[in-house]
Curated annotation (Swiss-Prot):
Database matches in Pfam families: Histone, Histone_H2A_C
Major place of residence: nucleus
Protein purpose: Core component of nucleosome. Nucleosomes wrap and compact DNA into chromatin, limiting DNA accessibility to the cellular machineries which require DNA as a template. Histones thereby play a central role in transcription regulation, DNA repair, DNA replication and chromosomal stability. DNA accessibility is regulated via a complex set of post-translational modifications of histones, also called histone code, and nucleosome remodeling.
S-S bridge residues: none
Keywords for this protein: Chromosome, DNA-binding, Nucleosome core, Nucleus
Keyword Phosphoprotein: no
Full protein name: Probable histone H2A.2
Region Disordered: start-end pairs: 1-24, 127-153
Superkingdom in the source lineage: Eukaryota
Notes concerning its domains: Contains one SPKK motif which may interact with the minor groove of A/T-rich DNA sites. Phosphorylation of this motif may regulate DNA binding. This motif is reiterated in both termini of histone H1 and in the N-terminus of sea urchin histones H2B, but its presence in the C-terminus seems to be unique to plant H2A.
């Protein structure tokens, strides 16, 4: 037997075969953008449980992707309301705090450089009177025009 006639099996038996088949990631299979494999690795490495099922990282990736999309959509709306093209932490804070469900979910979270929600205590606002509601028919007296002051010599 000649050693050169044997096929080497170091590459999984495909050494002389055709082109390699394109790999399909679990993220692509699930139709997700978030990395299913990386999340699965983190679940295993974090020792949250002895074993991690095959569906757990897919489900978690889908949930995280949904939450990220929701926050980014609301933050994009906040940026557009402020006539800006770029989302900054302030827009993220406004989006999260103005949304009831996200505000409840992220109640204990501090967003760096987010600031605070604008809020004025109603007691400090000027009181509405009856005169402001009804239009007064009396014209206001015009202000006297200020003439030129005489030049000082």
């Amino acid at each position: 037997m000649d050693a050169s006639t044997k096929t080497k099996k170091g590459a999984g038996g495909r050494k002389g075969g055709g082109p390699r088949k394109k790999s399909v990631t679990r993220s692509i299979r699930a139709g997700l953008q978030f990395p299913v494999g990386r999340i699965g690795r983190y679940l295993k490495k974090g020792r949250y449980a002895q074993r991690v099922g095959t569906g757990a990282p897919v489900y978690l990736a889908a949930v995280l992707e949904y939450l990220a999309a929701e926050v980014l959509e609301l933050a994009g709306n906040a940026a557009r309301d402020n006539k800006k093209n770029r989302i900054i932490p302030r827009h993220v804070l406004l989006a999260v705090r103005n949304d009831e469900e996200l505000g409840k979910l992220l109640a204990g979270v501090t967003i760096a450089h987010g600031g605070v929600l604008p809020n004025i205590n109603p007691v400090l606002l000027p009181k509405k009177t009856e005169r402001s509601n009804t239009v007064s028919k009396e014209p206001k007296s015009p202000k006297p025009k200020a003439g030129k002051s005489p030049k000082k010599a």
